[in-house]
Amino acid sequence: MAVLVVLLSSLVSSALANEFSILRSPGSVVFRNGNWPIPGDRIPDVAALSMGFSVKEDLSWPGLAVGNLFHRPRATIMVTVKGVDKLALPTGSVISYPLENAVPFSLDSVANSIHSLFSEETPVVLQLAPSEERVYMVGKANSVFEDLSVTLRQLRNRLFQENSVLNSLPLNSLSRNNEVDLLFLSELQVLHDISSLLSRHKHLAKDHSPDLYSLELAGLDELGKRYGEDSEQFRDASRILVDALQKFADDMYSLYGGNAVVELVTVKSFDTSLVRKSRTILETKQENTQSPYNLAYKYNLEYSVVFNLVLWIMTGLALAVIITSYNIWNMDPGYDSIIYRMTNQKIRMD
């Protein structure tokens, strides 16, 4: 029995070891201090609600309170760090919550809401995963971040330029000649370049359309696989990453005038077993729903309403034109009309 309790406690602790942290947030978005766990699949809903968008299912999570509905943040910046359950963040300015059921997630729903509501204003939407060479830029992000390095070769070349982070970061046990170390450092370079490029276009951070940034960093995970989590390289990289994230959060928060939410997700590894696979052994074959009888198109339920409106309005207009034309054609002005008076006067003059 004691062994079972120990196993259950270890499973629960491992399931809640990951963290969801709020690095920066404006006064209009209220995050409460507490130890309330947040499901991994509801993180996009937290981002959507904090920006003032609606979600399909109500979020009964006490960590997010109702803020100022008329003053929403101009940007949401979410950074996902893989390979570590938590980082040594400063406890004073950061609010952290346990993350349960850490399943892979995306902010596509938030991006779609931004596109549908602010399509004419072309907001900045940037989703980037440097280690996978995955990038998604829409709106003004194409012009702002067109010089951003996104492929592994571009990232490597960017690191060896004069103004790269290699010249300012204390590498300690990390090496410039190791591909895994360079991958981690290149992700830090991406963080620096995003804030640097945005600082050249500060007017974009002051418009009325909200912006979205989603970054996924896997360099620390690769370092843990290469050297081990107890290695000096992993510890040095964790400290460097904390400092880089703090600086990145401060820069983005300052560029948006203190009206941005900067969020951090630290996950040891995503639990893909909780995600439904696209193909399973119980998958049924797709049935052909087309009818072989060449039936007519199934119209919308409102078709009869629209048809009757158009029919009777056109009928009324046609009758009005016919009646008006008939009355004008058969109109008798009478002998006292000016037409006849002018005619009689003309006759007398003749």
From Swiss-Prot:
The record marks 276-279 as: Cleavage. Residues 18-302 are extracellular. Coiled coil: none annotated. Residues 324-350 are cytoplasmic. Keywords: Cell membrane, Cell projection, Cleavage on pair of basic residues, Cytoplasmic vesicle, Endoplasmic reticulum, Endosome, Lysosome, Membrane, Phosphoprotein, Postsynaptic cell membrane, Receptor, Signal, Synapse, Transmembrane, Transmembrane helix. Multifunctional protein which functions as a renin, prorenin cellular receptor and is involved in the assembly of the lysosomal proton-transporting V-type ATPase (V-ATPase) and the acidification of the endo-lysosomal system. May mediate renin-dependent cellular responses by activating ERK1 and ERK2. By increasing the catalytic efficiency of renin in AGT/angiotensinogen conversion to angiotensin I, may also play a role in the renin-angiotensin system (RAS). This is Renin receptor. It comes from Rattus norvegicus. The gene is Atp6ap2.
